[in-house]
Swiss-Prot record:
It comes from Canis lupus (Gray wolf). PANTHER family: NADH-UBIQUINONE OXIDOREDUCTASE CHAIN 5. It catalyses: a ubiquinone + NADH + 5 H(+)(in) = a ubiquinol + NAD(+) + 4 H(+)(out). The keyword Chloroplast does not apply. Keywords: Electron transport, Membrane, Mitochondrion, Mitochondrion inner membrane, NAD, Respiratory chain, Translocase, Transmembrane, Transmembrane helix, Transport, Ubiquinone. GO terms for cellular component: mitochondrial inner membrane. GO terms for biological process: electron transport coupled proton transport; mitochondrial electron transport, NADH to ubiquinone; mitochondrial respiratory chain complex I assembly. The keyword Mitochondrion applies. This is NADH-ubiquinone oxidoreductase chain 5. Pfam families: NADH5_C, Proton_antipo_M, Proton_antipo_N. The lineage of its organism: Eukaryota, Metazoa, Chordata, Craniata, Vertebrata.
Length: 606
């Protein structure tokens, strides 16, 4: 096992070499991106050695080399947990990052700060590796916050654009809400169990884990863009396409789901948390799939599909299948990163045009990119024998055979069908039909950096699902009987989605313009969530604050207490002291009546 742990640590150390290099003159060299890409590829190849050893032997390792500090009775040490989840995820993340970095060398070649961009990507990858291999909550929190801050820096890379700055701040603010849950969980474990070590937490027999698990669920909701904290993910598409491909499809956004997988031993017997996870994931996967149907920005459609797949992973955890959720994380990384890279290739070729209504006919001028996009879309929908099929089909089968509420299962099936619909929509608008872009644009995809990076992920999108699914324990699957209609459910709803999209396409051809319906507005305006949360809520808050400030400060203190109070007291005192009101006629009449009455009384007595 020494070789096992040594190879893994070597792979992690290799990644830090370009960071150390940034303090030397080599950092200013034009070849620095090449050094970073090469270091990532070597780290991937070395990490495959312990992964293959683990698959063969099935023994996990915990490395605790460096004791950091002791707080009263609690010890904090640097500890790495090399188990199934970390051993499979590390090579997948390194392979995807290797391809994305090669793609970035083509996509960002004209950026004057490309060296800093690659350093940020590498720092993000290192913090993600720290998160995945952490064996205690403190180390996990370092990786958790690391991916958060690197996400902020990379989303706001083009800081001259207002939208990019707003999107970066939005991502940080939504993730801070999730971080509150993470810190609350850490505090609870510290107060009640006096440990942050994962093994010690798991062996504790405490039935009252609702509060820390709710904190973990809140943390996962923020980081994995679940319903309620979801708007930051589509907004993050303002960053460069390589950032979207790496952070917001295959690594950072799955950190929340990975956190719940890590703490699944605490969740598996807690029905309350599992039900919440199931319902939250089901709502997310349906809502974001509906939103994706009417979007026109190609990157935002892919972003909403990411959020929908994250909801599907949460559903899988909710039905007590963490290994299937992890399998979907790994398979999803290949085709989703490739979809973003194909989108980036199209956007770059069309002079930064992202509207699918202004594309069309690209299969003639970008044959390799469009072929990869179609295969990636088919893998996303779960087409048989592509990578997505091996995880998505198993998830739908597990949901069909589990004793959960049929409501969550039904809306998950609807979302699966809608996935096929919006994937078909991208193909129709962007790839097929007549070109709708300027004929003056020179389109060229003959660049080895672009072709090789997409080609590697294309191979992964076809074969990776078969390879990874056969390494999940137990490797020998027991025989299981299932009715044909249940077995074919996933494929049936996918085909239904394709048919629905084709029918809608045929129906809408040649129609006159009509004002959009309320359903269309609900989908295109993202369920009015950004309008309510980002416009109405701040406006209402500012209006109430302004009114209360002006009424309390100006009207009450500055007017009533000082100037108005003086005049009020003067008028009140003058009213009390002087009863003279200036009514001369009334006074004269009163005087005459009094005189006449007095004379009459005197005459009467006389």
């Amino acid at each position: 096992m020494n070789m096992f742990s040594s190879c893994m640590i070597t792979a992690l150390v290799i990644l830090t070499l370009p960071i150390i290099m940034s303090s030397t003159k080599l950092y200013k060299n034009k070849l620095y991106p090449y050094y970073v890409k090469t270091a990532t590829s070597y780290a991937f190849m070395i990490s495959m050695i312990p992964t293959m050893m683990f698959i063969y032997s099935g023994q996990e390792t915990i490395i605790s080399n460096w004791h950091w500090m002791t707080i009263q009775t609690m010890k904090l040490s640097m500890s790495f947990k090399l188990d199934y989840f970390s051993m499979i995820f590390v090579p997948v993340a390194l392979f995807v990052t290797w391809s994305i970095m090669e793609f970035s060398m083509w996509y960002m070649h004209s950026d004057p700060y490309i060296n800093r961009f690659f350093k940020y990507l590498l720092l993000f990858l290192i913090t993600m590796m720290v998160l995945v291999t952490a064996n205690n909550m403190f180390q996990l929190f370092i990786g958790w916050e690391g991916v958060g801050i690197m996400s902020f820096l990379l989303i706001g890379w083009w800081y001259g654009r207002t939208d990019a700055n707003t999107a970066a701040l939005q991502a940080v603010l939504y993730n801070r809400i999730g971080d509150v849950g993470f810190i609350m969980t850490m505090a609870w474990f510290l107060l009640n169990l006096n440990t942050w070590d994962l093994q010690q937490i798991f062996i504790t027999t405490n039935d009252n884990f609702n509060l820390p698990l709710l904190g973990l669920l809140l943390a996962a909701t923020g980081k994995s863009a679940q319903f309620g904290l979801h708007p930051w993910l589509p907004s993050a598409m303002e960053g460069p396409t390589p950032v979207s491909a790496l952070l917001h499809s295959s690594t950072m956004v799955v950190a929340g789901v990975f956190l719940l997988i890590r703490f699944h031993p605490l969740m598996e017997h807690n029905q309350t948390i599992q039900t919440l996870t199931l319902c939250l994931g089901a709502i997310t996967t349906l809502f974001t799939a509906i939103c994706a149907l009417t979007q026109n920005d190609i990157k935002k459609i892919v972003a909403f599909s990411t959020s929908s797949q994250l909801g599907l992973m949460m559903v899988t955890i909710g039905i007590n299948q963490p290994y299937l959720a992890f399998l979907h994380i790994c398979t999803h990384a290949f085709f989703k990163a490739m979809l973003f890279m194909c989108s980036g290739s199209i956007i770059h070729s069309l002079n930064d045009e992202q509207d699918i209504r202004k594309m069309g006919g690209l299969f003639k001028v970008l044959p390799f990119t469009t072929t990869s996009l179609i295969i990636g879309s088919l893998a996303l929908t779960g087409m048989p024998f592509l990578t997505g099929f091996y995880s998505k089909d198993l998830i739908i089968e597990s949901a069909n055979t589990s004793n959960t509420n049929a409501w969550a299962l039904l809306i998950t099936l609807v979302a699966t069908s809608l996935t096929a619909a919006y994937s078909t929509r991208i193909m129709f608008f962007a790839l097929l039909g007549q070109p709708r872009f300027s004929p003056m644009i020179l389109i060229n995809e003959n660049n080895p950096l672009l072709i090789n990076s997409i080609k590697r992920l294309l191979i992964g999108s076809v074969f990776a699902g078969y390879i990874i699914s056969h390494s999940i324990t137990p490797t020998t699957i027991p025989q299981m009987t299932m009715p044909h209609y249940l077995k074919m459910t996933a494929l049936a709803v996918t085909i239904l989605g394709f048919i629905l999209a084709l029918e809608l396409n045929l129906t809408t051809q040649g129609l006159k313009f009509n004002y959009p319906s309320n359903y269309f507005k609900f989908s295109s305006l993202l369920g009015y969530y950004p309008t309510i949360m980002h416009r109405l809520t701040p406006k209402t808050s500012l209006t109430i604050s302004q009114k209360s400030a002006s009424m309390l400060l100006d009207s009450i203190w500055l007017e009533n207490i000082l100037p108005k109070s003086i005049s009020y007291f003067q008028m009140k005192s003058s009213t009390l002291i002087s009863n003279q009101k200036g009514l001369i006629k009334l006074y004269f009449l009163s005087f005459m009546l009094t005189m006449i009455l007095s004379l009459l009384i005197l005459n009467y007595h006389g």
